[in-house]
From Swiss-Prot:
Record field: compositional bias (Acidic residues): 867-906
Region (Disordered): 231-322, 865-906
Descriptive protein name: Uncharacterized plasmid pDG1 103 kDa protein
Biased composition (Pro residues): 264-281
The keyword Nucleotide-binding appears for this protein: no
Other information: The expression of this protein is suppressed by cAMP.
Residue stretches of biased makeup (Polar residues): 302-314
Keywords, comma-separated and alphabetical: Plasmid
InterPro entries named among the record's database cross-references: Dict_REP (IPR007778)
Compositional bias per record (Low complexity), positions renumbered to this chain: 236-250
Pfam families: Dicty_REP
Taxonomy, superkingdom: Eukaryota
Length: 906
């Protein structure tokens, strides 16, 4: 999902298919058919099927046969066909299609081939959503066990699976060599179901406003989420950057001023390289019992204005100034995982839940620190946010430590279980800080407290987290050196040797095993092994003997790795979850327990001159508005929209704010995960629920099936998509945290709970923030507590993400004009592309003709040059004959000299 594109972009590929292939109607009126995926076809799907059919016929050298006919594909299982559809009568029971049977042990009984393929396809993609678009297709046996463990009892499971995978492999192999697919590498390895799904498109009945909004979001999937809601006045609008800690590449979204109608995203400029200044002699830095955290840079460090400690008080050490010769750190916001150690994310969330419910006591946050085995709190200056952001962590090489680095790193050692507290300077009377708990020498879930609406710079937070990981790594390296009694020079020597001795490590391990055998069975091996030589090789007197110890130390360390490609020992990019706690300072009448606990530490933050008025802060804190904005939840949202600034980031602008100026829409994002095609559907009124299905109204008026169809779907908002087998999923209720719109937009978007009904054989996993919070099996209706701004679930190759979007009423009045303008812009772009294509073809044609003329000219010149060389050869032979005659004439009285001269002149 890294390169999302509008669903319409797929039809550029469709147009190419239309030029080469014409549809052939295969199903005749009144004929019986057992084709796979019946009653799901559109004209585009039939075109795609004809393409595959023609390719398969080419592959089989003209052998006739409908390769998409059920009886042809599944010769061994055609007797299992349960339903015999008839095109004229449609004499089947809709209840029978959607009926789900279970055996005595609770397993789902599947004897319909379409449903069996549906289950196999869904479970295959559950592990890897792009499994069928890769160059090599895994075999069915790799997922057969998964099907059994998922609770399905499929008759002739192996026979169906093997035949289905054989068909997929035949289609992939044939298409990969076909001219239409070779030209488009993205579709070369065909995902049959995903391509049929893309052809079938996504259809939903919407009102005009809903249609226009859906079009905008679908055509521009990279648009900033909720780009069309009211912004503040341009003079007060701030540019914010929001990223998550879950992707290896920094993704940002920027809120730009609304005054300028031309979108001009401005990325943050990278700091220019600076020349390191001479480093003065290091002085002793005041610290706690085990040393305090100090800002360090591995390459160049300058320590300025570090006072000599006058007492043993645990005061905050003044920060050192980092002077880096590299560019800005290449930030990678790390992937959110469950917290390791003794503090879990669930524990933190439960405490935040207590704060939301006003269940706060003086020892509430104390319990969080007690979970960390330590009440020790280390405070660090807020300058660390800016200083750590200037460090290029990718350039750090632990194998080239300098003396001053070693001196400073000895002061990085602190207790294995401690709490780091770093304030943020957000203004007078506004409190914000980053809490980093360290458990057993490793970081666990971090907490960031910030005012509601304040800029949260996750890039700096990530840099700070990596800096603390660097500090932990440096401390552990010092501990390793002290344990082995190594000097810095010895450590450098061992580290540099380790980078080039992978074979050496293997030999050492083999020697250790041999030594163990000698000790255990001395009589058997001493005759064949030189024990003295072996012990000398394993002797710890030289640096070579410690290489295997260093290798084991690095292999088991959470933050250090060996990079053979760059011959260096580097800092890992280790996942560390960050939870964001926001509060509204304007609406509160209560005090919160954790401020009492942090009071003494917060009082240290006025060293830079910015004083925090603690009493005002305590009275202004809003426990009932505290929201847990977990980074893993934000990550799922950002994946859907990629959160990249686009040309529509300021497509709709407006002024003013307030709950009376906004409309709330439900946004359903449908993503074809195989090809990263996206369609967004927005609904305003969902009081009757939302139905997602491939069922179509093909029944006779007043028939039983027609009445049952209306009962199933009712008056719900229908989204029709392509599935390989009958499927109906209904979101019956969506309960928002705010029944009426408030001034808090985040609170307005929050979904409290949903009621979902699953009429399919597929188990629906409800995902919030990357975690499965609940599962709904087939033929079940269940209420799921969401408590987030978005949730998602997947069926086959489609991922459905449901969230809320706020749109201003003023902007809705102009939406039709905006859509029309955007369509006109797209037309102009397409015309430019066509003109460019014509110019390119004309250039290639003229260039080819010119090349032909050049080749002809070269041949002519070569032929002329060859003729000229032949004439020169003839003249040379004549000269040799003349010289022979001259020699003969010289023997006679020198007569004929004149003749010889004349010959030479000729």
């Amino acid at each position: 999902m890294q390169n999302l594109a509008p669903w319409e972009s797929f039809f550029m590929f469709v147009n190419i298919l239309l030029r080469d292939y014409e549809p052939v109607k295969r199903r005749q009126q009144g004929s019986e058919s057992n084709e796979v995926m019946k009653y799901s076809f559109t004209v585009d799907t039939l075109i795609c099927r004809e393409l595959f059919r023609s390719i398969l016929k080419e592959k089989t050298l003209g052998i006739l046969g409908d390769y998409l006919n059920r009886e042809c594909i599944f010769e061994r299982t055609k007797k299992l066909v349960k339903l015999n559809y008839n095109d004229d009568e449609y004499d089947y029971d809709l209840d029978d299609i959607l009926k789900i049977r279970k055996n005595s042990s609770g397993k789902l009984i599947v004897d319909d081939i379409d449903q069996a393929i549906f289950i196999i396809d869904h479970l295959s993609r559950k592990v890897d959503c792009k499994v069928f678009t890769k160059k090599s297709l895994v075999g069915f046996r790799h997922i057969e066990k998964t099907i059994t463990e998922a609770g399905y009892k499929i008759r002739e499971r192996r026979s169906i699976g093997l035949d289905w995978y054989t068909l997929l492999n035949d289609i992939r192999t044939s298409c990969a060599k076909h001219r239409t697919f070779v030209a488009f590498s993205k579709y070369r390895y065909v995902d049959f179901i995903a391509m049929l799904t893309a052809f079938h498109q996504v259809k939903a009945a919407k009102s005009n406003e809903e249609e226009h909004l859906s079009t905008i979001y679908s055509l521009y999937p990279f648009v900033e989420h909720n780009f069309d809601e009211d912004k503040e006045d341009a003079a007060t609008t701030k540019q914010t950057t929001t990223t998550t800690t879950t992707t290896p590449q920094t993704r940002t979204r920027k809120r730009q001023a609304t005054g300028d109608n031309t979108p001009t995203p401005t990325p943050a400029p990278a700091p220019k390289p600076t020349t390191p200044k001479p480093t003065p002699a290091p002085r002793k830095i005041s610290s706690r019992k085990n040393g305090g955290l100090t800002n360090v840079r591995v390459d160049h460090i300058s320590v300025n204005n570090i006072p000599t400690p006058s007492d043993t008080n645990e005061s905050l050490s003044p920060p050192s100034t980092i002077i880096s010769s590299s560019n800005s750190i290449k930030q990678c916001l790390v992937e959110v995982l469950e917290s390791k150690g003794e503090i879990s994310i669930d524990k933190i969330k439960s405490i935040f839940n207590c704060l939301q419910n006003k269940q706060y006591t003086g020892d509430l946050i104390d319990s969080m620190f007690q979970q960390n085995k330590s009440e020790k709190v280390i405070t660090i200056s807020s300058k660390l946010f800016n200083m750590s952001n200037k460090v290029d962590y990718d350039e750090i090489n632990f194998a080239k430590l300098k003396d001053d680095i070693l001196y400073l790193s000895r002061r990085l050692i602190y207790e294995k279980n401690t709490n780091l507290l770093i304030p943020t300077e957000e203004g007078e009377g506004i409190i914000g800080f980053l809490w980093l708990p360290v458990v057993n020498g490793a970081l666990t879930a971090s907490v960031y407290v910030s005012q509601l609406g304040a800029d949260v710079d996750f890039k700096k937070i990530s840099a700070t987290v990596r800096f603390v990981q660097l500090c932990i790594s440096m401390s552990d390296i010092i501990g390793f050196m002290e344990l082995r009694s190594l000097s810095l020079d010895a450590f450098r020597s061992i580290a540099n040797e380790l980078l080039y001795m992978s074979d050496r490590i293997l030999n050492l391990e083999a020697d250790l095993r041999t030594l163990k055998d000698i000790v255990m069975k001395p009589t058997n091996l001493k005759k064949h092994v030189n024990v003295d030589n072996l012990f000398s090789r394993l002797s710890p007197e030289g640096s070579n003997g410690f290489a295997n110890y260093l290798y084991d130390f690095i292999s088991n360390h959470p933050y250090i790795k060996i990079d053979k490609s760059q011959n260096s020992i580097k800092l890992k990019e280790t996942p560390n979850p960050v939870l964001v706690l926001t509060y509204d300072p304007k609406v509160v009448e209560h005090k919160v327990g954790f401020l009492f606990h942090c009071r003494s530490e917060i009082s240290r933050f006025n060293a830079g001159g910015n004083k925090f008025i603690l009493n005002n802060i305590q009275h202004s804190f809003t426990p009932n508005n505290i929201g847990v904005l977990s980074q893993d939840r934000e990550n799922d949202l950002k994946r859907n929209y990629s959160m990249l600034t686009s040309n529509t980031s300021k497509l709709i602008t407006g002024t003013g704010s307030g709950e009376h100026n906004l409309e709330r829409f439900i946004s359903i994002t449908i993503n074809n995960t195989a090809y990263d095609l996206i369609r967004v559907v927005l609904f305003r009124d969902i009081s009757n629920g939302i139905s997602i299905s491939n069922l179509r109204d093909i029944f006779r008026e007043n028939s039983d099936n027609r009445n049952r169809y209306l009962e199933y779907l009712g008056k719900s908002r229908l989204i029709r998509v392509f599935f390989i087998a009958p499927c109906l999923i209904q979101i019956l209720e969506v309960n928002f945290a705010a029944t009426q719109l408030t001034a808090d937009k985040n609170f307005n978007r929050a979904i409290k709970s949903i009621k979902i009904r699953n009429l399919s054989y597929i188990t629906i996993d409800i995902i919030v923030g990357g975690n499965v919070i609940d599962s709904i099996r087939g033929d079940a209706t269940q209420v799921v507590q969401i408590n987030a701004s978005e949730f998602s679930f997947s069926v086959s190759c489609l991922k459905f993400s449901v969230s809320a979007t706020l749109v201003s009423k003023k902007n809705l009045q102009n939406i039709s004009t905006i859509v029309l303008n955007k369509y006109n812009e797209e037309k102009s772009y397409l015309q430019c592309v066509k003109k460019f294509s014509k110019l390119s073809k004309s250039f290639i044609r003229k260039f080819t003709g010119m090349n032909i003329n050049i080749n002809a000219l070269e041949e002519l010149l070569l032929s002329e040059a060859g003729a000229y060389e032949d004439d020169d050869d003839d003249e040379g032979e004549g000269n040799e004959d003349d010289e022979d005659n001259d020699e003969n004439e010289d023997e006679d009285e020198g007569e004929g000299e004149g003749d010889s001269s004349e010959d030479e002149d000729e």
